[in-house]
């Protein structure tokens, strides 16, 4: 984080003019009933859909218009990860208050919700949301524990080069009853640490392949035609599934709800000939 959270907790009612450089804080503020504080969002915001109509879009994911953001006179700007470090630095040089989260696990996602709740004086509502997500996760775990067979799952975040699941996605796979074949790679902080070769996937021979290419549609046919992939169980059994990036690659409420449901739906039931 670039600023201490306590700065805003101590102020009356918290910040009143918030710019969200990524979708997650926007969705969180809406769920907290604090959307009236939002004055700017990213062009990639799709949750909730009404946000695009209500707030000006002032940033992409990596960069944004410092001038437009400053013209909104924000008292807090919220962003995500080292990918937005350059934009954050520009905004700080422009005397803006910037808060950068870097949540990579489900627990960290929940902590972000609680932190934003504290910042906008909506702690009780934030705790209620988090309790609900924890309950849903426990239900998913209990359901998964009843499954005799835990399918091996390969999640592909990008195709060339291929990147396997980031940490929270790997955790969702495990919660839903699957076994992430590259779970160790998910602990890497950098995307490069999750790079895999197509031959590595062949060696792992997953039962299910989940694909969510950040920024473009998944080409299932091209995946099928990769060298050696015709021997993979998931390919032979037509178990390649695309998941919308907006519900799985956003480290916020979307992943804990629609993302978890999508992962559960695509691999909880396997054809008997895949075992």
Language model features: what each stretch is:
Residues 1-268:
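N-terminal ligand-binding lobe of clamshell/alpha-beta domains
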Residues 267-275:
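Single conserved hydrophobic/aromatic residue that forms the stacking wall/gate
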């Amino acid at each position: 984080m670039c600023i201490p959270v306590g700065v805003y907790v101590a102020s009356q009612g918290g910040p009143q003019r918030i710019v969200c450089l990524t979708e997650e804080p926007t969705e969180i503020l809406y769920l907290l009933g604090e959307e009236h504080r939002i004055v700017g969002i990213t062009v990639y915001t799709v949750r909730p859909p009404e946000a695009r109509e209500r707030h000006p879009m002032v940033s992409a994911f990596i960069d944004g218009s410092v001038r437009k953001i400053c013209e909104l006179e924000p008292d807090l700007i919220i962003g995500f990860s080292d990918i937005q470090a350059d934009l954050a630095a520009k905004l700080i040089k422009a005397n803006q208050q910037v808060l950068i989260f870097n949540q990579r696990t489900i627990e960290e996602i929940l902590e972000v919700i609680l932190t934003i709740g504290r910042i906008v004086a909506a702690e009780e509502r934030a705790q209620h949301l988090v309790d609900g997500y924890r309950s849903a996760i426990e239900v998913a775990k209990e359901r998964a524990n009843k499954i005799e067979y835990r399918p091996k799952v390969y999640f592909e975040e990008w195709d060339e080069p291929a990147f396997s699941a980031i940490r929270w996605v790997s955790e969702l796979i495990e919660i839903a009853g699957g076994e992430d074949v590259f779970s160790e790679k998910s602990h890497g902080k950098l995307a490069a640490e999750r790079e895999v070769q197509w031959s590595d996937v062949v060696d792992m021979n997953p039962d299910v392949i989940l694909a969510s290419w950040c920024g473009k549609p998944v080409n299932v046919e091209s995946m099928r035609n990769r060298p050696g992939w015709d021997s993979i169980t998931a390919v032979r059994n037509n178990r390649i599934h695309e998941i919308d990036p907006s519900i799985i690659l956003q480290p916020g409420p979307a992943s804990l709800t629609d993302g978890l449901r999508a992962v559960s739906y695509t691999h909880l039931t396997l054809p008997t000939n895949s075992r």
